[in-house]
Amino acid sequence: MLRCSLGLVKHGLTGMTTSTPPTAPAAKRLTPPTVAARAHQIIGWLHQRRDRLRAHGVQQYFKHEVVSLGIATPALRAFAVAQSKPLTAAWGLREATALCDRLLQEPELEVRGMGILILGAFRRRFRPALARAGRRWLETRLDNWALVDSFCGSVLSPLLEQHPGVEKTLRRWSGARCLWVRRAAIVTLVPFARHGQLLETVYELAGEHFADPEDLMHKAVGWVLREAGKTDPRRLRAYLCRHGPAIPRTTLRYAIERFPGSERRQLLECTRPSARGAPRGGASRRA
């Protein structure tokens, strides 16, 4: 993914860096902080480190206007670790979810991203019911690809790893009217596809979005197909040839990035629509 100052997108199930910023406020261990107090502290710390020039540069990665503080990625991640360590000792999942909910109410990318990263530190305590809060956030507060992809990597993918039944939830989400819910259904599967897991689901859901009107869905589908091809390129090749002209060209180009140049050209040619207006497959929005 593109590297902007937000730096929140996680392409797997690994944890965050363990370095700690020297200026981060000390966390108290004896008395568990209230959600409101910790949210106030986090918001204040982040706003104090606003970099207007860097924030202006973040905008180039988004088609619509976003609000950014322009905080450098290392400082942002290190502060997330500094906050998460004592909170995982003092809090349960309920408090962590409440903190995330509170921070997601703020307009800045970094503040909302911090809520996601801290909630992700509680991954070992995740319960399937967290998916309900996740859908609500996707429909109301996670409104760009960077935050959605970060939420998938930090929260939804670990949730699916611990509770395989969440796969059924993702199948329902795949047909949602909300773009961000649909994207989350696909991006959550990326780390699994990379390791050759849940490939039946990956290929099935990918096919539902060939007719999706959103370019961000075409890119997400291409991404997950590319990852699926890392462990079984023959299966990906057969899938692409079978669906041929129905596949959006953006999806196809993303999916074949790992193939040799000559094979990429061959796949682009053999999947090219034979005539303008060739029908595209896909399912209609359901929920």
Feature annotation, model-predicted:
Residues 11:
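Cationic, low-complexity basic patches in intrinsically disordered or flexible, solvent-exposed regions
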